[in-house]
């Protein structure tokens, strides 16, 4: 990959190149190794742009809050990890969950991360990007985007981004196709077509 001029992104891309990760191999997503923590420029903004089949989201990543999660997110995104993955669990008035390579909620990469938490950073409104997990120390590639305030998740799920574009459009489109009964089943397939990173 050509240098981007951003030290954090270039370090992540170098790690990808050095590890010779073969994304053409079947099942590659579950064998992806843990990246090395990147050092982010505090003067820059890092965004996760997610093109779904019901619209596009732009999410500001929060390296000052969760640097390892943001490192991992840029790493997975630059690998093409999220492309074609579905939102396997969407519950109205709660959240949309995706990022499972198996599409079932049971998969992830070959590493797990501990939660990263910061005082004053809360699931206090719709549009928070947070790590889904199966308990402490099990964060991987699965994530959720909140549809409302869910402060009871604070300290259990690491917040590492916030929707800045698409909250009143794409997020609403995801929600209305979710379940009302808590099952998480969607009324039609919902998936990520393409995810990219933007730095400004």
Q: Can you annotate each of these PLM segments?
A:
Residues 1-200:
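Cyclophilin-like peptidyl-prolyl cis-trans isomerases
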């Amino acid at each position: 990959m050509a240098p981007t001029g951003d030290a954090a992104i270039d370090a992540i891309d170098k790690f990808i190149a050095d590890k010779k990760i073969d994304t053409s191999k079947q099942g590659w997503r579950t064998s992806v190794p843990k990246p090395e923590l990147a050092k982010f420029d505090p003067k820059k903004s890092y965004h996760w742009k997610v093109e779904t089949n019901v619209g596009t989201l732009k999410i500001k990543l929060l390296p000052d809050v969760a640097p390892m999660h943001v490192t991992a997110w840029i790493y997975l995104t630059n690998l093409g990890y999220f492309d074609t993955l579905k939102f396997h669990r969407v519950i109205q008035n709660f959240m949309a969950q995706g990022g499972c390579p198996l599409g079932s909620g049971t998969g992830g990469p070959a590493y797990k991360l501990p939660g990263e938490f910061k005082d004053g950073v809360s699931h206090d409104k719709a549009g928070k990007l947070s790590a889904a997990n199966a308990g402490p120390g099990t964060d991987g590639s699965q994530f959720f985007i909140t549809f409302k305030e869910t402060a009871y998740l604070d300290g259990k799920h690491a917040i590492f981004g916030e929707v800045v574009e698409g909250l009143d459009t794409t997020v609403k489109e995801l929600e209305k196709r979710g379940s009302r009964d808590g099952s998480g089943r969607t009324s039609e397939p919902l998936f990520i077509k393409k995810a990219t990173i933007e730095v400004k």
